[in-house]
Amino acid sequence: MMKSSKVSTILLLLFVVIIGSFCLTYGAPSTTNQKPLTSSEKKLLNDLYDRAKKAGGVVEFKSNLDSKKFVTAQNRPYDLLALFTSSNPKYGCSGCVQLKNQIESFSLSYEPYLNSAGFLEKPIFIVILEVDYNMEVFQTIGLNTIPHLLFIPSGSKPITQKGYAYTGFEQTSSQSISDFIYSHSKIRIEPVKTFYEKYSVQILSFVVFLASVRFLITAYRKRKSPMFWYFLTILLFACVIMGIFYDFIHKPNFYEFDHRQQTYNYFSRGSRSQTVSEGMIMGVSTIAITLIFVFLSDILPNYTNFSSKSKGLLFFMGMSSIIVLLFFQSLAFQIKYYRPLFFIPSVTYHY
């Protein structure tokens, strides 16, 4: 009995020693591999840190000297989120202004992290480079268009757009910028949200609930009205068609295959041409649906000699004309993101 007790005690001690050794070896991340900063790197970090504190978060470089010193410097001891843009109407556009305003708005969320105690352990700075003052940096990186939002990691690697460019210009928000930073640096900056941003889902859900109740009451009262069901069918068709075109235009980010060059290329996302074409598609289709609805709901009932069969035939002819109209509109607006005709490559990429 004594012998078995001693064996159990020895095995328990051995188990504790093994677990303790494992915890000491793998339990905490090793900091011995972290290379200490040189005096020049510390000075560079402190200089940019002071400028960020004075600027309230976002630093705007006004000269090539500043951008060379902090952006294209060797052995950068910090990460950068750099917006390459222009306020000059000669170069800039509405997208530049919108993105710059969004970055400046994001500084409200970034400033608490800038002032936190652990900032210098994982430093990241947000900078804005205007093309008028930083042309050399634009040429060095190879930027021919604006705006560009790039994540620039610490170190001495050449700055590149591949894999480090922000692509969500159409739906830019503080949350999407925060997610972009986290995806590259694992630094989580919680965006400051307004009352509407915090509770928009709840507000929208409540509005939809009230609208649904109202619709059910109306549907019950109008259940014997043929024109109500005509209107409902048209509305359903319109929503489906609009949804198809919206989905086709906006997502996902397809590639098209160039058979001559044997390369894949992005479908164009040019904001101006896309806005014009999309607006015409949605606008003309909405007008067509409205006219047909007015005809079916107001003019058609006044003709008593029209049978229900004739009304049904006119309805389906109207809906067919809408579908044909939308198809020919898609032929008319064959910009890059419509080319070739409704061809979706077998290889697609989702971001």
UniProtKB/Swiss-Prot annotation:
GO terms for cellular component: oligosaccharyltransferase complex. Pfam families: OST3_OST6 (PF04756). It is found in: Endoplasmic reticulum membrane. This is Probable dolichyl-diphosphooligosaccharide--protein glycosyltransferase subunit 3. Component of the oligosaccharyltransferase (OST) complex. InterPro entries: OligosaccharylTrfase_OST3/OST6. One of its GO terms (molecular function) is dolichyl-diphosphooligosaccharide-protein glycotransferase activity. The chain crosses the membrane at residues 199-219, 226-246, 280-300, 313-333. It is a multi-pass membrane protein. It comes from Dictyostelium discoideum. Its main location: endoplasmic reticulum. Residues 1-27 form the signal peptide. Disulfide bonds join C93-C96. Belongs to the OST3/OST6 family. The gene is ost3. Keywords: Disulfide bond, Endoplasmic reticulum, Membrane, Signal, Transmembrane, Transmembrane helix.
